[in-house]
Structures are given as C-alpha cells and as structure tokens.
C-alpha cells in the first residue's frame, strides 16, 4: 500500500497538533475545580468522566499525522495508569509541556539528541529530590486523605481507609456496582492470585469477561492436564451433583481444554480452568495454601496421588469464585478453621526465620491471602451515568492509595514539582543543547500548578511565583483559594504517582523530539455509489 511522508519541522508540527488536541481535552479535568468530559458510546448512555486515561483511550483523530501525535501521548497516560493507577492527567499535561518547549528549541536549531540527554539528567534529579521529600504513610488518616483527594470525595476516602484497615495493606479490595443508591463496604474472607482463565470461552459474564462460580468444587493439582480421560471419573460425579468446577492445574490444554469449552458453550457443564500461581517450590506452597483454605487435597505425584483416582471428597469448596482474564478470587473457602490457623502460624514462623527480603515479601503476601480477605466496595448512584463516573473515581482513588502505601506521599496540587525546581535548576552542563534540556524540565515542572490554578479560574503565573517563594510544602489549595501547608491540610499525592507521571511524560516527549520523518497510509478514497440502472422505458411519457 502506498504511503504519505512528511519530514522535519512539517512532520513534528503535524504531530504536535494531535498532542495538543488530546492533552487539551484531558487537562480540563485536573484539580479540585477541574471539569468533566463527556464520551460518546456506540452502545448505551454517554460516559461522563474526569479520568485522564479513560478520555485518552477514546480519542482517535482523522488526520493520520495528528493521530500519531495523539497516540504517543496516549501511551504516557496508559503507562502511568499501568504503573501507578492514577496521575494520568498530570502525565499527559507534562508530556505536552515538554514537547511544546522542546519543539521551540529544535525549530531554533538545537540538537534533539543532546536535548534528550539534558531532559534525562533533569528528570533523574527531580525524581531523586521528590523521593527525599517523600513522607511515609502513617495510619488510617493518611490513607483516607490520599483516597479523598484522588476521588474528590471525603466519604470515598473514609471507605477505602476502612477497607485497607480491615484486609491489611496486602489484602485484596475489589469494586463492584451496587443495586442500591448508596456506596458501601462489604468485607468477605477470601484469597486472590494473579492467574486468569486459560480460555475466554470460559467466561460466564461476557460483558465483564468474568467467570463467576457459586458454590463450586475446586480441583487442585500441580500436573498438566491434556487428556480428558484422566479427570473423567471425577467430572461425571460433579455433573451428577449439578455443581460447577474450578480446576487449578499447571496447565490445561489440547483435548481436555477443548472438551471443557465445548461443554460450557452447550450449557452441559460449567468448568473454569486456571493455571497454578507461582513457580517451583513456591507454587507447591501456594497450592497447599489454596487446599487448606478450601478444604481440598493437592493432587501431586510426589504425594502419591493420581488424577484418575480423584474423588469428590478430595476437592475443595468455596462460597464463590470469580475469575477474570488476569485474576482469580476465592471467597469464603470451606476449609477447617483450625487447619487454616495452623497454616498461618507456620507461615509466620517462616517469616521470622528467613533472612531474604524477597522471601519475606512473598511469605507476607501468602499470609495476607490466607488471613486477610477480600473487601468489596459496592458503588451506588441514582443513574447509570453517575454510577460509571463514580466507579472510575473510586478505582483511581484505590490505585492512588496502594501507591501511597508503597512509596509514601508528597505535598499535592503540583506543589512537590515546584518544590524540587530549585535543586533541578542547579544542574549545569557545558554542552549548550543539553542545558536547554535541563531548562525545559525546570519550566515544565510548573505546569501542573498552572493548570490547576487555570481550572480554578485564577492566574497560574501568580500562584507559581507565590509557591516558589514560600517554604517547601506550602501550596495553593484551589478548592478554598488559599495557601496552606499541603500535607497538614490533607492535600497529598502518592510519591509513586508523582514520580511515574514525570518519568513517563519525559520518556515519550524526549523521543518525540528526535522525530525527523513521519510515514502514514494514504487514506482510501470512498468510491461513489453507482447510479440506479434505467427502467428500459426511455422516451415514454
């Protein structure tokens, strides 16, 4: 297929138009007085949201060069969302600022490769300084503040803090839609591991692409199942009992998987298969954890057990199991409570004995899954549109809270970026174009405060100067229009979110500046519809 080409300044400017279109749409949502964006949906009601990554994902531009620019910045939002779960609007805004300042200098003749070196130096220094001013999360109150700022709702903050208190920092918190108007917290004991179904055809809810099994049997084995004959005796017993089955195995493939999928599609029998979590010896231990929790037996060769000999009383059971593409949650396993306590004490003893930090971390995870549980936040609202918007905000708040527990918190409202400007500005380079790269980051670090102020209807430059000349930690509270100590006032951002947003924005933006040519498909011309043929009655009146 023939291609269109653009070079140099022409290519970069076309792509920058796309960057600006996407970033200008996203950045109106930043801060406590940020607005919402309405997204048209092919099916159902429009979605109203202020979630940066949800907005970015919806944007496709007609012009291929503009679209390239938009897709590059979309990657900034997506990557930040994947790493930190929040901060996508800030990341998009920073990328736009770095690209804008960078292009001015590249157009004036600066070398983009040297500019990129300067950008990297400045970002590394900024991240180092952000980590220095970071404060560890201290108790329930700090958690509530982080969540409340992210969701712009104090009630949500309290709810997430309660959830984390009940299941622990390593516990599992899921968000579901409620059938009532209110938002409430429901804590159920359960275990989650990061393995999803082996085939999407096993999903029972095709809209959410999840498989939900109520009161199922659970077959736990470290073997690979490829021949259906191996598990046929126990399958026949389960079909007669009318229950569903979850298989946790090393792998399930070939004829065995095909048979299970076909039976599921025909409605004969519902079975979901997932791969066993972990690797090596850790996998054996995790399978034993699941067996203890559900009251089942691990079918393993080293224990002298074969699949063909499995009977129903060797299977585990639970109130419910939810399996998505990536995760499995077992809720209310029917294992013996004394056996579970014994297993928990065993893991605690191993934690005390081990000297390896990695092993300790993995043991803590296992302990949380056995002893913690699953907290479910049920989101309610008057309309479906409000419900979806609220759910997105709570998802962001939960991700922000987890990030805060991981790496700590810094002053919010863009204040942390302004606080590190002086240290970053001290960086110098003998190479003029590298120094330009450093200066670009120094200027771009002001952008989040400027945009929060603009969205609140005040002049950003005035706010930035005031914050720069104040003590570190003093920032602008856009909601109340006053200067306060941000951490004491509860306006905080997770360090991980603040750091990731800057790193991802700089990574994509500095690569963007080195672009010298752009190649795109020539749009296909629409062929006009042929005219209707004559009726064979020419000349008649």
Curated annotation (Swiss-Prot):
**What is an annotated GO biological process for this record, any one?**
protein refolding
Q: Which UniProt keywords apply?
A: ATP-binding, Chaperone, Cytoplasm, Isomerase, Nucleotide-binding
Cystine crosslinks: none
Query: Which residues bind ATP per the record?
Result: 29-32, 86-90, 413, 477-479, 493
Enzyme Commission no? 5.6.1.7
**Gene3D superfamilies from the UniProt entry:** GroEL, GroEL-like equatorial domain, TCP-1-like chaperonin intermediate domain
For whether the record's keyword set contains 4Fe-4S, the answer is: no
Cellular localisation: Cytoplasm
Q: Name one Pfam family in it.
A: Cpn60_TCP1
Offer a single GO CC term for the protein.
cytoplasm
Which EC class heads this enzyme's classification? isomerase
**Is Chaperone tagged as a keyword?**
yes
Q: Which GO terms describe its molecular function?
A: ATP binding; ATP-dependent protein folding chaperone; isomerase activity; unfolded protein binding
Q: Which reaction does it catalyse?
A: ATP + H2O + a folded polypeptide = ADP + phosphate + an unfolded polypeptide
The record, for NCBIfam families, names:
GroEL, PRK00013.1, PRK12849.1, PRK12850.1, PRK12851.1
Check the record and name the HAMAP family matching this protein: CH60
Function in brief: Together with its co-chaperonin GroES, plays an essential role in assisting protein folding. The GroEL-GroES system forms a nano-cage that allows encapsulation of the non-native substrate proteins and provides a physical environment optimized to promote and accelerate protein folding.
Q: Which PANTHER family match?
A: 60 KDA HEAT SHOCK PROTEIN, MITOCHONDRIAL
Sequence similarity: Belongs to the chaperonin (HSP60) family.
Its assembly, as annotated, is: Forms a cylinder of 14 subunits composed of two heptameric rings stacked back-to-back. Interacts with the co-chaperonin GroES.
Q: What is the official name of this protein in its record?
A: Chaperonin GroEL
What is the originating organism of this protein?
Answer: Clostridium beijerinckii (strain ATCC 51743 / NCIMB 8052) (Clostridium acetobutylicum)
Gene name of the encoded protein:
groEL
């Amino acid at each position: 297929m023939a291609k269109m080409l653009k070079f140099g300044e022409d290519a970069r400017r076309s792509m920058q138009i796309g960057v600006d279109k996407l970033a200008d749409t996203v950045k109106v949502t930043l801060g406590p007085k940020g607005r919402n964006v309405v997204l048209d949906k092919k099916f159902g009601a429009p979605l109203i949201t202020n979630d940066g990554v949800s907005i970015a994902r919806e944007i496709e531009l007609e012009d291929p060069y503009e679209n390239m620019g938009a897709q590059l910045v979309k990657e900034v939002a997506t990557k930040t969302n994947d790493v930190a779960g929040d901060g996508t609007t800030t990341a998009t805004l920073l990328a736009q600022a770095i690209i804008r300042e960078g292009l001015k200098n590249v157009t004036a003749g600066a070398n983009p490769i040297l500019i990129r070196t300067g950008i990297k130096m400045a970002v590394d220094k900024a991240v180092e300084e952000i980590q220095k001013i970071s404060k560890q999360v201290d108790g329930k109150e700090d958690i509530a503040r982080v969540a409340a700022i992210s969701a712009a709702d104090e009630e949500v903050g309290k709810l997430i803090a309660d959830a984390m208190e009940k299941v622990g920092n390593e516990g599992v918190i899921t968000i579901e839609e409620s059938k009532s108007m209110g938002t409430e917290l429901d804590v159920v004991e359960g275990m989650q591991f990061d393995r999803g179904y082996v085939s999407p055809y096993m999903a029972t809810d095709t809209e959410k692409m999840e498989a939900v099994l109520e009161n199922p049997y659970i077959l736990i084995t470290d073997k690979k199942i490829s021949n259906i004959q191996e598990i046929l005796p126990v399958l026949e017993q389960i079909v007669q009992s009318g229950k569903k089955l979850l298989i946790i195995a090393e792998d399930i493939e070939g004829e065995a998987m095909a048979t299970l999928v076909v039976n599921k599609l025909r409605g004969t029998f519902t079975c979901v298969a997932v791969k066993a979590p972990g690797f090596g010896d850790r996998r054996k231990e995790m399978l034993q954890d699941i067996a203890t929790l559900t009251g089942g037996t691990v079918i393993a060769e080293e224990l002298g057990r074969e699949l063909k000999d499995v009977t129903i009383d060797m299977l585990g059971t639970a109130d419910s199991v939810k399996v998505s593409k990536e995760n499995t949650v077992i809720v209310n396993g029917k294992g013996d409570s004394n056996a579970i306590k014994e297993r928990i004490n065993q893991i605690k003893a191993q934690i005390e004995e081990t000297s390896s930090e990695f092993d300790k971390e993995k043991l803590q995870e296992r302990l949380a899954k056995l002893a913690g549980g699953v907290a479910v936040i049920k989101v309610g609202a008057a309309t479906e549109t409000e419900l979806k918007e609220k759910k997105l905000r709570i998802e962001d708040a939960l991700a922000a809270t987890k990030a805060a527990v991981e790496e700590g918190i810094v002053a919010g409202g863009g204040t942390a970026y302004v606080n590190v400007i002086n240290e970053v500005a001290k960086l110098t380079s003998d190479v003029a174009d590298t120094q330009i790269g450093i200066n670009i980051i120094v200027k771009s670090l002001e952008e989040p405060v400027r945009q929060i102020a603009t969205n609140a209807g005040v002049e950003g430059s005035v706010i930035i100067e005031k914050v720069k000349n104040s003590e570190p930690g003093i920032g602008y509270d856009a909601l109340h229009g006053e200067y306060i100590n941000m951490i004491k006032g509860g306006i905080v951002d997770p360090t991980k979110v603040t750091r990731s947003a800057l790193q991802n924005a700089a990574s994509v933006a500095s690569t963007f500046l080195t672009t010298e040519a752009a190649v795109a498909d020539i749009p296909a011309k629409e062929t006009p519809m042929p005219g209707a043929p004559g009726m064979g009655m020419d000349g008649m009146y």
